[in-house]
Amino acid sequence: PVPVWHPGENDREAAALAVATEILAGGRSALLNREIVDKQRKAFAAAAGYDPFSMGTDLWFAYGMLGPKQTPEAFEKALWATIDGLRDKGPDAAQLAAAKRRMIADEVFAQDSLYIRAKQIGSLEVVGIGADRRDDWLQALGSVTGKDVQKVLKQWIVPARSITGLLQPEVKS
């Protein structure tokens, strides 16, 4: 498990986990897609996720969808190498700025939809954060540094804390 956001207590930690996830998996040009899918061809899709707005703790997860000649072992090795690279070097300034800009823009543009606004308000209220703290989250995202990203990856996203699973389709004879 990884920590979720508790306003005023762990703003930077939760926001840094969210930004790290965005750098790794936020769209086609994200690190996992660029490195594992496009460059190394260890999977035909790769992604990661984290929800900072949960009760208690949450899970940080990553996954890949493999083709016939792609192995789980090769994917997992490439996944950890990509995460290790971000953890060791940190994001470059452009990566960090782009990730934060996308996340903040997504939050702002989500306000154009009554459905999404209601969903966000309800979610924040249900988990005990309170909808009035939404702008605090945007400020927390904006304050994340490259060192913050490295710190949370070193603390939370490490092989010793991971569990690997393999889902395979049922083979019918």
Model-derived regions: residue spans:
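His/Glu-based metal-binding/catalytic segments typifying zinc-dependent metallopeptidases
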Residues: 1-31, 53
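M16 family metallopeptidases and their MPP-like homologs
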Residues: 1-7, 33-143, 161-169
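Generic solvent-exposed, charged/amphipathic alpha-helical segments
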Residues: 20-21, 33, 80, 150, ...
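Short coil/turn residues that cap or connect secondary-structure elements
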Residues: 24, 28, 70, 87, ...
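In a subset of proteins, long, contiguous C-terminal domains/tails are tracked
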Residues: 145-173
